[in-house]
Amino acid sequence: MRLGIDIGKVIINGPAHPEGGDTAFFTGDTARLLRTPSMPGAFETIARLVTLFDGRVWLVSKCGERVERRTLQWLAHHDFAGRTGIPPDHVRFCRRRPDKAIHCAELGITHFVDDTLDVHEALRGLVPHLYLFGGHQSGPEWLEHTPTWASVEEAITATFAGTPGERGR
């Protein structure tokens, strides 16, 4: 089994920036960018999921080149690799949301966490376990709504119950 995780509004909590929201991450200077907090519980939960998935965890994000550079700066500044166990070469970017499906197919992703419904629609039928992250009221019945990192961990861990031989696939 293999896990894919979006970055913006799933790991990086742009809307909670101390200086007033998402735009500080996208348009502010480097110091403002680096002050953008992570989502509550993200680093700790992801570290446990990396162990559960035996290191088979990737970040897959849609953004332009500038935001890609800023995202990599943020991840490095917050020691994301050291704190979670996800190495820098397990971070992938694409320019269009539906293109996340290309990365998921190449990597054999079986579980994916994203806050955007259209990404899940692109992954439907390709990735068996889809988790809609964040404060959405609801989503289609073919995906699981996970408003917090605690609920993500609970939902994903439940898929491992009774399948110890499946972990390496």
List PLM regions with ranges.
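Active-site neighborhood of HAD-like aspartate-dependent phosphohydrolases
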Residues: M1-P40, E44-R48
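Short coil/turn segments at beta-strand junctions that form active-site/ligand-binding loops
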Residues: M1-R2, G55-R56, T110
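Short acidic, S/G/P-rich loop/turn micro-motifs used as interaction or catalytic elements
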Residues: I11-I12, E65-R66, V119
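Short, flexible active-site-adjacent loop segments at beta-strand->alpha-helix junctions, enriched
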Residues: P15-H17, C63, R97, H136
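Conserved short-loop catalytic and cofactor-binding motifs
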Residues: T30-L33, L59-C63, P88, R92
